[in-house]
Every structure is written in C-alpha cells, then in structure tokens.
Amino acid sequence: AAAELGNISDRRSYLLLEGKFGLPRLLTESSGLNSGFMIPQYTTAALVTENKTLCFPASADSIPTSLGQEDHVSMGSISGRKFNQVLGNLENILAVELMFGAQGLEFRRPAKCSKYVENAYNLIRTKVEKLEDDRLIGEDMLAIAELIRERKFEVI
C-alpha cells in the first residue's frame, strides 16, 4: 500500500508539471531558461520504481537454517528493513508533491484555498521558498520530508 501511495503521489505531481490547468510547464515562468521542477520528478519516478522492487516478498527466497530444523524461514527482518526503506522513500515522494503543490498555489494568488490547504502551504513556506530560478532543491525536499516525519501536517 505504501508503494502504491507513492505511485499515486508521483502521478499527481506529474499532472502539476504538464502545463495544464492554467499552470506553467514545470511550474516555472521561464521553462525554456529554467528546468523548474523537472529533476525532482525524476527523483520521485526513481523512488517509486525502487519501492516497487523493494516490495518483492523476501519470503520468496527462503533457505534452511538451524541444521535443517527450520526448513522455511520467513525472512521477516529483511521485510522489515525493506518496508522501512519504502516508508523513507514515500516521505520523499510526498515531500516533492507538497513542494509542487505549494509552487502551484503561487500561480493562483491572490486566490485563497481552504484553511487547511493554506495552513499546509504556510508550513511548507517556513522551510522552502518559491522557486523563481533554478537552484539546488534537494535540501528543500528533505526539509519537507522532515516535516512529514515530525508529523507537523497532522495538526493542520
């Protein structure tokens, strides 16, 4: 389910970049001169694919242990580690979607959204400023992912 949520988030993010719905392509005013949010979408696509591979069941490959007394081992510890990685990747995927959403709202101003969306937008803007020109934005993704990990969006 976590891997699928990441896939859905990536597809929603992609829709924001297409240049439809009255938003500029790549969520930048000068997409010919700037890459906008092209690279973070590559990142989410890679993380989504990684999550799909991590969801292959570890129990599909069992090996006898304990001098043959344990003929089928669940590989539960491996599954737990893989799931932890999927969740970390999902946090980054969702962070990119939130970053794209905040940028998209910039092009809708002065219109306002619901108080919940505005609160989320304001929280994001405490960590990440609007993208005007190309810059390194990996730290922006990590800052929003940290907000997710800290459950800051739950109080909105």
What are these regions (language model features)?
Residues 1-156:
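C-terminal auxiliary extensions adjacent to catalytic cores
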